[in-house]
From Swiss-Prot:
Pfam families, per database record: Abhydrolase_6
Name the UniProt record assigns to this protein: Alpha/beta hydrolase nvfD
Source organism of this protein record: Aspergillus novofumigatus (strain IBT 16806)
Keywords linked to the UniProt accession: Hydrolase
GO BP of this protein: novofumigatonin biosynthetic process
Pathway recorded for this protein: Secondary metabolite biosynthesis; terpenoid biosynthesis
Superkingdom of source: Eukaryota
Mutant lacking the gene: phenotype: Completely abolishes the production of novofumigatonin, but accumulates fumigatonoid A and asnovolin A.
Keyword Translocase: no
Function: Alpha/beta hydrolase; part of the gene cluster that mediates the biosynthesis of novofumigatonin, a heavily oxygenated meroterpenoid containing a unique orthoester moiety. The first step of the pathway is the synthesis of 3,5-dimethylorsellinic acid (DMOA) by the polyketide synthase nvfA via condensation of one acetyl-CoA starter unit with 3 malonyl-CoA units and 2 methylations. DMOA is then converted to farnesyl-DMOA by the farnesyltransferase nvfB.
Higher taxonomy: Eukaryota, Fungi, Dikarya, Ascomycota, Pezizomycotina
EC code: 3.1.1.-
Active-site residues, Swiss-Prot/TrEMBL: D198, H226
Length: 250
């Protein structure tokens, strides 16, 4: 049976290179896998919305789906919104028999929003626990380089964190305030990886998003920070394989 293709969508500031450890491991397991470059990253002038990012993801999907291969989309952080938008009209129920579909969405400490909300809106503290979490852990300013190591890469080895920081690009702020037009997690089976030691998107905020939709998400937990692909790539690969249909323990 043909395995689904795995498409990884980078989070804000990040490039495909940040996810190559996952891609290479999946290749060794006979998965077709790719991390997609986002046109908005370091764009000049800055792109006003995520529209071109979504189009880049859809092109990657069609590369596999047009030949009948199903696809699993993996979104990290900000790109949770993008994988939902890119899946519009591509679920199994939307497509005729024989065409590949988006069969699962994976949210890695990612933003999952209802229609009409944005990343910035979803990260506004809504409970006393969330207010306290942001006060103690600090919500990252994308322009504050001094916080990047501690907030994004707190569970990574120092050399890995240095390398990751050296690759970071600039993220147009307006892409993060663009409201969602589609909530694919309500119609496509979805997995949410809660990273309990995440200092960028606190655990309680991840849990709130993962509990949306009356059980829409299969919830998986790990004791990683905001960059599990770098701090524990083997765990992430096991999680992806499980979500893709393999009967393995995470």
């Amino acid at each position: 049976m043909l395995k689904p293709a795995i498409i990884i969508v980078p989070g804000a500031l990040h490039r495909p290179e940040h996810y190559q450890g996952i891609v290479s491991r999946l290749h060794k397991l006979q998965y077709e896998a790719v991390a997609v470059s986002m046109p908005s990253l370091s764009s000049s002038p800055p792109q006003p919305t995520w529209t071109e990012d979504v189009e880049a993801i859809r092109k990657a999907i069609f590369k596999f789906s047009e030949s009948g291969q199903d696809v699993v989309l993996v979104g990290h952080s900000y790109s949770g919104i993008l994988i939902s938008e890119a899946s519009k009209g591509l679920s199994r129920k939307d497509l005729p028999h024989g065409e590949g579909a988006v069969v699962r969405l994976i949210y890695m400490c990612a933003i999952a929003v209802p229609v009409g909300e944005s990343l910035t809106g979803q990260l506004e503290p809504r409970t006393p626990q969330e207010v306290e979490a942001f006060r103690e852990e600090g919500s990252i300013s994308l322009l504050d380089a001094d916080k990047v190591r501690d907030v994004l890469y707190n569970k990574c080895e120092p050399k890995v964190a240095d390398w990751a920081i050296s690759l970071l690009g600039k993220q147009p702020v307006t892409t993060m305030s663009t409201p969602a037009t589609h909530a694919a997690w309500l119609e496509i089976p979805s997995t949410y990886l809660i990273c309990e030691d995440d200092l960028a998107v606190p655990e309680c905020v991840q849990l709130r998003m993962a509990k949306q939709g009356n059980g829409a998400f299969d919830i998986v937990r790990c004791q990683e920070g905001h960059a599990p692909c770098l701090s524990n790539p083997d765990l992430v690969v096991r999680m992806i394989r499980n979500a893709a249909g393999e009967a393995i323990e995470i």
